[in-house]
Amino acid sequence: MSKIIGIDLGTTNSAVAVLEGTESKIIPNPEGNRTTPSVVAFKNGEIIVGDAAKRQAVTNPETIISIKSKMGTSEKVSANGKEYTPQEISAMILQNLKATAESYLGEKVEKAVITVPAYFNDAQRQATKDAGKIAGLEVERIVNEPTAAALAYGLDKTDKDEKILVFDLGGGTFDVSILELGDGVFDVLATAGNNKLGGDDFDQKIIDWMVAEFKKENGIDLGQDKMALQRLKDAAEKAKKDLSGVTTTQISLPFITAGAAGPLHLEMALTRAKFDELTHDLVEATRQPVRQALSDAGLSTSDIDEVLLVGGSTRIPAVVELVRHETNKEPNKSVNPDEVVAMGAAIQGGVITGDVKDVVLLDVTPLSLGIETMGGVFTKLIDRNTTIPTSKSQVFSTAADNQPAVDIHVLQGERPMAADNKTLGRFQLTDIPAAPRGIPQIEVTFDIDKNGIVSVKAKDLGTQKEQTIVIKSNSGLSDEEIDKMMKDAEANADADAKRKEEVDTRNEADALVFQTEKTLKDLEGKVEEAEVKKAEDAKEELKKALEGEDIDDIKAKSEALSEIAQNLAVKLYEQANAAQGEASEATDAQEGPKDANTFDGDFEESK
């Protein structure tokens, strides 16, 4: 069975891993980095992903960051003269990671396990699966990020019974999960979190502070300057990282804008104390989910054996301090917070292929599921933190006499009123025989698969008529749309490969021109003029071809020059060998014939 790669599709950074033997390994990208920025840019019709896209973000307004925060919504982003769904942009990142894995493994990769925040709702999970499909990946499993982290941590500890708390603060999302590990079973007991809280919010606090301070000093609002804002974002991210290791950092942005008197520079010092003050509300927002998860699991802090920190934002000292305070434990530092999720996803891939034995993963649904009933009430069928996959049925009836149809309004959330929860979908069961209200028996069944994706069935027990839907949110893509996007993605991949081939061909041709010029210089006066002219003409033909766009012409001219250059090189070597032979003969002639009584030998000096 072919390898199943593990992918951590993050808000700010992503990572890809693979199981080698019994060990999960992060695959470095072509730049040698173990994580890849989740950044996509468009330039002259070309798609740029990762480190290269992030490097040019300051000067390129067609750069898209933090697309994960839009997954599961109908929001689109405009770039490259068209509109893209979050799934399409995410697919470009996934394609990049897929190519990295294929280059490393030396084989095609078609299957992946992709992680999502534990608190992702159905729409966000479905969108992630669609992104994988567009990227040409069969998504074997969607795994919650904290669960994947626990897998990576606990794979070699399956003989122990432990309860662990995973505190996962990434670039754009926050989750807390409580898991029980024992006999190879990874059982998620509870999960809580916030899909709108992460490292990006910490960056934004620094940006807002810099904008306010600069306006106070210079009367200019940098918040209105798109290019300045991108420079501020980069500086804020760097300052945040610096303050994890030092207590003060200098922010220096020369020529940030221009005033009436000329260019203006931004020079500010940010202390850790000030940073803690600016971000106090964000750190505090992580406290309640920790308590909620413990409460839902029916545990106290003394029951927790280990605390794992996941996500780059858990390096912030104030966050670490809050975790210490809430759990009365020193967080475990044995896992790399940036890499552990992808590694866990690769392990789950190994479980699916059978390479990892005796490991069972029992995940949970993060939010309650149910339907709207009379009076706009939210009636739950499946409570949050129920182990998945699962199925639950309940019988309902009509609200009016002779009601011919019922509307099934499917919801996800925790609020008592339907209007306050997230709509997953609506469908109708029709042709209900006329009867007084309360008589028809309508059975509603919820199914949640191992990926946390929901399907709902309504059945009239009298007529046995039923209606089923797999939940598609308002951002859900039809199969036709996904197929079209897959073809577009493949076309882009082909175009990228063609572009790379063109660049390689041009580079090789340039090198050949340079090498030929060097060879001709070395052969000056040593070969016939006709041969030199033949090489000169072929070289000029290739240089002329390089000025055009016809790659086939460049290839043909390169081959012609290469053949001539090889013949010249052979002549150069022949001449060098001939000269060496002549020199050797001349030396022998100078030494004269040896005396018959003379012989060569070694001697030792006697002492």
Curated annotation (Swiss-Prot):
The modification Phosphothreonine is found at residue 173. Keywords: ATP-binding, Chaperone, Nucleotide-binding, Phosphoprotein, Stress response. Induction: By stress conditions e.g. heat shock. Coiled coil: none annotated. InterPro entries: ATPase_NBD, Chaperone_DnaK, Heat_shock_70_CS, HSP70_C_sf, HSP70_peptide-bd_sf, Hsp_70_fam. Belongs to the heat shock protein 70 family. Acts as a chaperone. Residues 577-607 are annotated as: Disordered. GO terms for molecular function: ATP binding; ATP-dependent protein folding chaperone; unfolded protein binding. HAMAP family: DnaK. This is Chaperone protein DnaK. Pfam families: HSP70. The lineage of its organism: Bacteria, Bacillati, Bacillota, Bacilli, Lactobacillales.
